[in-house]
Amino acid sequence: MKKRKLKVLSIIVVLVLALLFWGYQKIERFADTPLAIQQETIFKLPAGTGRVALEGLLVRDKLVRNGRWFQWLLKLEPELAEFKAGTYRFTPGMTVRQMLKLLASGKEAQFTARFIEGSRLRDWQQVLQQSKYLKHTLAGKSEAEIAAALGIPAGETPEGHLYPDTYQYTAGMSDIALLKRAHVRMNKALQAAWAGRDTSLPYKTPEELLTMASIVEKETAVPEERSKVASVFVNRLRIGMRLQTDPTVIYGMGESYNGNKIGRAH
């Protein structure tokens, strides 16, 4: 009788172990299953989202085909449950485990905004407006208001004070915060250029150097021609001659310039 009980108990233990192994295999297979996406997908995880709520979001957005093993995976690997709120980028081939590790890392998706040389403020504003993951706060703001927000002296335009480049940002960053980064970058570049300038050049302040650089940039779009154009303007300044260049007039006309040829009346 005792032997029979031991035999039955042994069978039960084997069955339990087999069931546990089967469950473990299922969980592992689920964890290594690729997300159900064919292209990059942006996923927003709201603050305060719990385990069950996350499962619901993933199933709702059809990112996982079957969430049956999701909670078991989080229990088996609790470090995967430490996910952080944010906006993330999921890529094709990413597995459920890799996705959870990304959410736990807090490494949010990076987006880009590209500003090209020679752009006017309205061009920068258009790029910002088209960047859908930015927080838009500048709508309806005048140049003077934007300049004030950037800490640019009254009476000066933001143009020329913003460094053209491709900037990365995370979802929720404000447009003015991005402009401030471009402004700080320009200030650093200007100070470096001023420190390394030829002291024989007729510029009294870094701002005068920046103004000339902006004029030369607008005078020619060909980089190879800029040194020659700059040389001509410098020589005119040295002899007290007017620059006689359209960009200086167009800049002064601002938004009133309609694209027509500049004449003596201007």
Residue locations for each model-derived region?
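Conserved catalytic or metal-liganding residues and their short signature motifs at active sites
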Residues: 1-244, 249-251
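Conserved small/polar residues in nucleotide/adenosyl-binding loops
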Residues: 265-266
